[in-house]
């Protein structure tokens, strides 16, 4: 059936804390955010700047844990300024027939003004019984920074 790219991780409305033109490249992100959604260091990400509409791709570099750091570096720093809101997406390539048979899972963080977790979602594609399609489900695990009573919360 062929390969498709599906979003597997998203950091929604994270705020740029610094923009460093002098760095060689990438975007530096608090590793606690990366770990929560499953983005790896050096993984390619697509980024949308909600303040100016600019889009770009780069790779991720882990910053200091717990700081909420989101710092575009190098050329990417010219597309952002401190305070801008970004959406950062990571994709994985999957075989379409595999997704129709096994489903797909993505993790999404919606950040607060300090880049802490305001909301956390697990979004899943669940195969239909016929194996010819999928249904989409979005489960909110954290609301307003507080865990909801949900068994999925224990997953990383």
Swiss-Prot record:
The active site is at residues 26, 59. Substrate binds at residues 58, 74-76. Binds 1 pyruvoyl group covalently per subunit. It is an enzyme of class 4 (lyase). It catalyses: L-aspartate + H(+) = beta-alanine + CO2. GO terms for biological process: alanine biosynthetic process; pantothenate biosynthetic process. The keyword DNA-binding does not apply. The keyword Manganese does not apply. This is Aspartate 1-decarboxylase. It comes from Gloeothece citriformis (strain PCC 7424) (Cyanothece sp. (strain PCC 7424)). The lineage of its organism: Bacteria, Bacillati, Cyanobacteriota, Cyanophyceae, Oscillatoriophycideae.
């Amino acid at each position: 059936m062929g390969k498709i790219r599906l979003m597997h991780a998203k950091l929604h409305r994270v705020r740029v804390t610094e923009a460093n033109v002098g760095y060689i490249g990438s975007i530096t992100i608090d590793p606690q955010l990366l770990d929560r959604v499953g983005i790896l260091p050096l993984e390619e990400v697509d980024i949308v700047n909600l303040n100016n509409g600019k889009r770009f791709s780069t790779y991720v570099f882990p910053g200091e844990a717990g700081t909420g750091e989101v710092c575009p570096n190098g050329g990417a720093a010219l597309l952002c300024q401190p305070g801008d809101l970004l959406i950062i997406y990571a994709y994985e390539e999957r075989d379409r027939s595999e997704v129709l048979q096994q489903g797909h899972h993505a993790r999404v963080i919606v950040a607060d003004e300090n880049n802490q977790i305001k909301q956390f979602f697990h979004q899943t594609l669940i195969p239909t019984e016929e194996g010819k399609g999928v249904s989409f489900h979005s489960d909110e695990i954290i609301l307003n920074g507080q865990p909801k009573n949900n068994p999925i919360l224990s997953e990383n």
